Amino acid sequence: MKRYLVLEDGTIYPGTGFGATTATVGELVFNTGMSGYQESITDQSYNGEILMFTYPLIGNYGINRDDHESIKPTCKGVVVHEVARRASNWRNAQSLDDYLKQNAIPGIMDIDTRAVTKHIRTKGAMKATIVDNVLPDTVDRLKVTELNRAVVAQSSTNNAYPNPATGPNVVVVDFGLKHSILRELAKRQCNLTVLPYNTTASEIMALNPDGVMLTNGPGDPKDVPGALEMIREVEKHVPLFGICLGHQLFALANGADTFKMKFGHRGFNHPVREIATGRIDFTSQNHGYAVDRDSLAQTDLLITHEEINDGTVEGLRHRDYAAFSVQYHPDAAPGPHDADHIFDEFIDLMAANQATQKGSQFNA
């Protein structure tokens, strides 16, 4: 079935449809990973976006039951060069085509995704649509289409739920979390309580947490202003750790600014340097916004990590509080596990804070 990928600037790419047969509109973004398409499609950080893969063959190992990063994918569409006709993997449960149909996500193939990526890198991120027919007003209608900005509310859990264990009590504030974050914390025996994105500081502190995690999520951090007051209050009392969107919200809550990147970081080969040690980790990333480096000068935040290629702020730490964040995904999924030691640093921070509190009680 003939379909078209139409960009906001009027560029049109003809291709062949697969997945759901509906039309769609979203921001077109590209992922440079050579694998991990299942984890990416089910990552809530892609909510509202049309996800394009630069690797030329997608779907060759199918979709399995284990690697979902969320229950329901929310990306608006999938763009590939070629979809594998047959999936070959012992865990394969269904084809990519069937999975997209099942979840009402349209796809388009036979697209030169590397050429489209070069176009996006030059022109910047823009809206796009996948349609069966290009009409005279298709581009004009695309230009005036307002994309949904309430994506965090859509991606977050509506109800609190536990993931019990015997270790430290960690409250996870869900802005669109990946299951791999919960897995990494569970590996370290954290007793988890996952809460909606709009939970207040008083509601969090009523659970007597040993630490608070701010997860990844979709969209512009400035569209979640209610989280900032919660962060400002919580960081005074217990260790706090933010990832991706959580990192950006942590920065905003402490007086820094964020900005929309030209085309973002989406892939899992991004080199990040830890400034204090010079250690370099290859990291998994998925973000279209970043912290403004210059805006940090008048805050109590210190830069701990930076992206080697373009200098993006990749890590922050508070001068006075036991609070820190990273822009990248130390949980990987997909990608390298170079940076999973960051979770151990969170565990150590909680242990040190508990020891300090016990010492204060003893001295009193």
UniProtKB/Swiss-Prot annotation:
Q: Name one GO molecular function term.
A: carbamoyl-phosphate synthase (glutamine-hydrolyzing) activity
* CDD domains (alphabetical): GATase1_CPSase
The answer to whether keyword Repeat applies is: no
Q: Which organism is it from?
A: Lactiplantibacillus plantarum (strain ATCC BAA-793 / NCIMB 8826 / WCFS1)
Q: Which SMART domains match?
A: CPSase_sm_chain (SM01097)
Q: In which pathway does it act?
A: Pyrimidine metabolism; UMP biosynthesis via de novo pathway; (S)-dihydroorotate from bicarbonate: step 1/3
One Pfam family this sequence matches: GATase
Q: What is this protein called?
A: Carbamoyl phosphate synthase pyrimidine-specific small chain
Q: Gene behind this chain?
A: pyrAA
